[in-house]
């Protein structure tokens, strides 16, 4: 069956159409700059990549555009061939501990969580409604970034703030990148051949977070109430003394919202280096001896190592350390800088194997006390797998209900 994975932002819509359960990517694409007359629509099949600039004023138009293109390019013959759609939704709060079939009730619950993710959930909802309008009979599912972390114990997800903040406003650590962590966890259970594996995962892209996993469950993670908490990233500061916000607001004559915006969009690599938020630019400048670039990278690496060491103690040892996402999968320098700072744990890097880019590989030596792996993530596939799983569950439930009705009526 054909399932579409969708990841929408406020001005973008990324999609991938997969044949399931074969896990075959049929087509992928992206609509950028939604809301302008200079939107960019890119669609890629196995053989060809098309790109066009055109007017796309809203998400509804973007959805209709991409679905029309699938038919025009003969990727599919009719829309009826699409049997499921999975939507990435950033915030599921404490309501959702698993992906959920999209119903009126589910959508209303997602809307109720917009206060917790004002930059993301509204855009996710707009995209969901757009797909529901064009594909009203198609089975659709919300896959949340936060559900994987709902297994964290209170001691790890609560802040030491007034407790009523949590009771009244749900102020707590929610984490992010959960779909990626779930996928990597399942991959590592297969690689290691054990369900009760203790794993530390470093998801490093423009957004960076870490997760401690025990027996397939998230125990702790670095991102918090929002993705701003944790380690420094491309443009995010990571952990910072909250009093700095008020101090800078007064000194710079800015609102609190503006200072938070600076911490989200003008900090991290970009803020410290003054060069770029892109790791490739930072690494190029490090090679040239740029001290600010070196400092920005060292700060990030130091904070990542802090989390790994903390999670090692939390888990009472680990079976594997895993690097994934854009930087984690492709930067040998990034990985080596982290691993060499972990030598006290007996982890030993294999320099030759560490040259790998974008492929699964064990990158430590045979006598390393901890195994370290590069494992590519695949969030689109993970979303499609959840759609397939929930659809099969619903089909089985319908059969059980019919059987029960038959027995009662008979």
From Swiss-Prot:
GO terms for cellular component: cytoplasm. It is found in: Cytoplasm. Pathway: Metabolic intermediate biosynthesis; acetyl-CoA biosynthesis; acetyl-CoA from acetate: step 1/2. Mg(2+) binds at residues 7, 379. The active site is at residue 145. InterPro entries: Ac/propionate_kinase (IPR004372), Aliphatic_acid_kin_short-chain (IPR000890), Aliphatic_acid_kinase_CS (IPR023865), ATPase_NBD (IPR043129). Belongs to the acetokinase family. Homodimer. Catalyzes the formation of acetyl phosphate from acetate and ATP. Can also catalyze the reverse reaction. NCBIfam families: ackA. This is Acetate kinase. It comes from Onion yellows phytoplasma (strain OY-M).
């Amino acid at each position: 069956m054909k399932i579409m994975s969708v990841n929408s932002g406020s001005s973008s819509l990324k999609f991938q159409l997969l044949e399931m359960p074969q896990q075959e990517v049929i087509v992928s694409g992206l609509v950028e700059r939604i809301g302008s007359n200079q939107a960019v629509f890119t669609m890629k099949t196995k053989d060809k990549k098309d790109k066009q600039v055109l007017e796309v004023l809203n998400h509804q138009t973007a959805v209709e555009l991409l679905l029309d293109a699938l038919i025009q390019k003969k990727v599919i013959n009719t829309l009826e061939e699409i049997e499921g759609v999975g939507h990435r939704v950033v915030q599921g709060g404490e309501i959702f501990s698993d992906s959920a079939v999209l119903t009126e009730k589910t959508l209303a619950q997602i809307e109720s969580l917009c206060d917790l993710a004002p930059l993301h959930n509204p855009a996710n909802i707009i995209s969901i409604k757009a797909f529901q309008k064009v594909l009203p009979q198609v089975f659709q599912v919300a896959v949340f970034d936060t559900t994987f972390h709902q297994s964290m114990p209170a001691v790890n997800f609560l802040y030491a703030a007034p407790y009523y903040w949590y009771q009244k406003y749900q102020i707590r650590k929610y984490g992010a990148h959960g779909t990626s962590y779930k996928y990597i966890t399942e991959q590592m259970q297969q690689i290691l051949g054990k369900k009760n594996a203790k794993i530390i995962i470093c998801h490093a892209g423009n957004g960076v977070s870490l997760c401690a996993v025990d027996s397939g469950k998230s125990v702790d993670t670095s991102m918090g109430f929002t993705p701003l908490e944790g380690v420094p990233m491309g443009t995010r500061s990571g952990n910072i003394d909250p009093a700095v916000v008020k101090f800078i607001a007064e000194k710079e004559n800015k609102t609190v919202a503006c200072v938070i915006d600076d911490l989200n969009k003008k900090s991290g690599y970009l803020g410290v280096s003054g060069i770029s938020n892109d790791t490739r630019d930072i690494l190029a400048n490090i090679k040239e001896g740029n001290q600010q670039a070196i400092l920005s990278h060292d700060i990030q690496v130091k904070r990542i190592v802090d989390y790994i060491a903390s999670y090692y103690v939390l888990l009472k040892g680990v079976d594997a350390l895993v690097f994934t996402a854009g930087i984690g999968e492709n930067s040998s320098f990034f990985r080596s800088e982290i691993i060499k700072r972990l030598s006290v744990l007996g982890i030993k890097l294999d320099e030759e194997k560490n040259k790998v880019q974008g492929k699964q590989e064990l990158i430590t030596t045979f006598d390393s006390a901890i195994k370290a792996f590069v494992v590519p993530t695949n969030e689109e596939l993970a979303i499609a797998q959840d759609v397939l799983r929930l659809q099969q569950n619903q089909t089985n439930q319908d059969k059980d209900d019919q059987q029960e009705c038959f027995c009662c009526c008979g």
